[in-house]
From Swiss-Prot:
The record marks L42, A43, R49 as: Required for CHRNB3 transcription activation but not for DNA binding. This is Transcription factor ATOH7. It comes from the Eukaryota. One of its GO terms (molecular function) is DNA-binding transcription factor activity, RNA polymerase II-specific. The gene is ATOH7. The keyword Transcription regulation applies. The basic motif confers specificity for the CHRNB3 promoter.
Amino acid sequence: MKTCQSSHLDSGVESDIQCRSGSGCVVKCSTERMESAAKRRLAANARERRRMQGLNTAFDRLRKVVPQWGQDKKLSKYETLQMALSYIMALTRILAEAERYSTEREWINLHCEHFHPESYHHYTGQKVATDSDPYAQRIFSYHPEHFQIAN
């Protein structure tokens, strides 16, 4: 004699229903198995939905801390990961570079050297007023001096 598993006992405990005629039990057992499979599928779907919601929330949080060039569209998951990787690598380079210099002052001087008078005119498209140009000396009384960074 065969025994069927009860649909309300998902723990695997066998019921007291014993089958004498095989066809009645097969129908009942297959129905119970289908109901059990449907319940498991619903539970798995709910777990997957929660997992995806958590993943999407994590991507949204990452998008908020990763710098974006334009705010016109939301970055895709792939773009978000690429930007996060680039951002982390840039920050790592900055930290590694800062460790190479013994003082904070040396690091600041390295990054501010392009602000010296002989080079900042190059960035603005202006030429430096020289002593040989009396017109420039008369018109522009201001003479740029070296920038100083306060400690």
